[in-house]
From Swiss-Prot:
Role, per record: Non-catalytic component of the RNA exosome complex which has 3'->5' exoribonuclease activity and participates in a multitude of cellular RNA processing, maturation and degradation events. In vitro, is a processive phosphorolytic exonuclease and requires a single-stranded poly(A) tail on the substrate RNA for its activity. Can complement the growth defect of a yeast mutant lacking RRP41 exonuclease. Required for normal development of female gametophytes.
SUPFAM superfamilies xref list: Ribonuclease PH domain 2-like, Ribosomal protein S5 domain 2-like
Pfam families associated with the record: RNase_PH (PF01138), RNase_PH_C (PF03725)
Subunit structure: Component of the RNA exosome complex. Interacts with RPP4.
Alphabetic keyword roster: Acetylation, Cytoplasm, Exosome, Nucleus, RNA-binding, rRNA processing
Protein name according to UniProt: Exosome complex component RRP41 homolog
Subcellular location: Cytoplasm; Nucleus, Nucleolus; Nucleus
Gene Ontology terms, MF aspect: RNA binding
The keyword Cytoplasm is assigned to this record: yes
GO cellular component, one term: nucleolus
Origin species: Arabidopsis thaliana (Mouse-ear cress)
One GO BP annotation of this record: rRNA processing
Amino acid sequence: MEYVNPEGLRLDGRRFNEMRQIVAEVGVVSKADGSAVFEMGNTKVIAAVYGPREIQNKSQQKKNDHAVVLCEYSMAQFSTGDRRRQKFDRRSTELSLVIRQTMEACILTELMPHSQIDIFLQVLQADGGTRSACINAATLALADAGIPMRDLAVSCSAGYLNSTPLLDLNYVEDSAGGADVTVGILPKLDKVSLLQMDAKLPMETFETVFALASEGCKAIAERIREVLQENTKQLEYRRAA
């Protein structure tokens, strides 16, 4: 299959360095302390944050001078064509751990001792890039909850398919067997918080793909800031009304 035509267009009409359309909204779960929906093309994730609140495991209360961050990732059974129960499969466990570690890097846990923060993520539609979409949704939900953070945690992926670097792979591209690099950054601090690669690449090629994913992260960070600023304006307008 030809994933990039002679005119330089991918199957969905994007250029190699174009992201899918991003749609995001906060405050979508009324009972949560913070929540968000984040869409990248046809991939859609909802995040809900509860906390900081008292540690539910009493044995850990005296041991923790930092907040405990817990994360649960799941996929809605209608999100893919796979009907098997996915909530407790190995991929969900692995992604829950990766997302938790990524969010711990941005949360100022030392300001909330003896407490816990719960992050729940559910993939409503899966079309590639679910890991990055979950991290971006979690960041929005944490900000919506007023959780203190040292920086935004943002993520994007890029791949290398048929000798071409591609930003923000969709499911068809991701399933084609090329390399996929997922990057998470703290943009203001200029730090990498996540780096995962599912295939070997020559160093020069890796650097190209990594740089492409990093640029995607910066664009997502800008979009997340816009969403949060717009939400702040709406809240101020309601208070003034």
